[in-house]
Amino acid sequence: MTGSTPPILPEHPGLNRLLVFLVHLFTASGTFFSLLALVAAIEKHWPQMFGWLAVALFVDGIDGVLARKLRAAETLPRFSGDILDLVVDYLGYVLVPALAIATGAILPPSLEMPAAAAILISSAIYFADRQMKTENWYFRGFPAVWNLVAFYLFLLRPDPRVALAIVVAFVALTFLPVLFIHPLRVKRLRPLNITLASIWSALAILTLVRDFSPPAYVTAILSLIGVYFLLAGLLRPKTSAPA
C-alpha cells in the first residue's frame, strides 16, 4: 500500500489505530491455533493437527491484506506487523510440522531428531534473512513452508530414506539462490495461481476428512499442483526480472 493511499477513516485516527491493533490481535491468534495443532501432534491426531494448521494458514492469508488496507505500519508504528507475522509463522510453518515429521513415523528412527533440528535451525536463519523476498514477491530460497512438506509426507508416505532425502533437499534449498513463487502476491499468472491454490485447499480439506486416505485422483491432483508451485519460480521467463 502506497503512502498516497488515505486511511480508511481519515477523520477518526483513533479508530484507525484501534482497527490496526485488532488486525494485530487477529494475526496473533495464529499462535493459539498453532498451540492447538501442537497438542494434536503430541497426541498423534494428524488430521486434527493439519486442520488447526489450516486455520492458522487462513489467518495468515488474510491478515496481511487487512494490514495493508489499513496502512498498519504508518497508522500504528509502535507494533511491527512483520515481526509479529514471523513469530506466528515460525510456530505454524516450522515448529509444529517439525514435531510431526519427527514423531509421525516418517523418517528413519535414528535420524528423526537430527532432521527436526535441521528444519528448525535452517528455518530460523531463513526468517532472519532481510532479503528473503524479491521486489516482485518471489521468495529467495525455500520459504520454510514445512507445514506443506509435512502434509505431502503424510499423504504420500514415501520410504523413510526417501522422506529423509526430501527433508535434506528442502533444508539445502533454504540457502540456495532459487526462487519460489508466492501464490497470492506474484502478479505473473496470479489468476491461475489463485485458482490452483483454491482447488488445492478444497482437496486438502477432503484429504483430512478422509484421514489421509483420499481417492487416488485427489492424491494425483494435489501432487500435480504441488509440483507446479514448486517449479513455478524456476520456470518464470528468463528475459526479464521476476514479475
Q: Where do the protein language model's features map onto the residues?
A:
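C-terminal membrane-associated helical module and adjoining short loops/tails
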Residues: 1-9, 139-243
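Cytosolic, membrane-interface loops and tails of multi-pass inner-membrane proteins
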Residues: 2-14, 62-81, 137-140, 243
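Active-site-proximal cofactor/substrate-binding loop regions of enzyme domains
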Residues: 10-72
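Short, amphipathic, aromatic/basic-enriched membrane-interface segments that mark the entry/exit
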Residues: 15-25, 79-87, 132-141, 183-191
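Multi-pass membrane catalytic core of lipid/isoprenoid biosynthesis enzymes
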Residues: 23-28, 69-126
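Helix-coil boundary and interhelical linker segments in multi-pass alpha-helical membrane proteins
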Residues: 36-52, 87, 91, 95-116, ...
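Alpha-helical transmembrane segments of multi-pass membrane proteins
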Residues: 53-60, 118-126, 170-177, 222-229
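C-terminal ends of transmembrane helices
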Residues: 65-74, 122-137, 175-184, 231-239
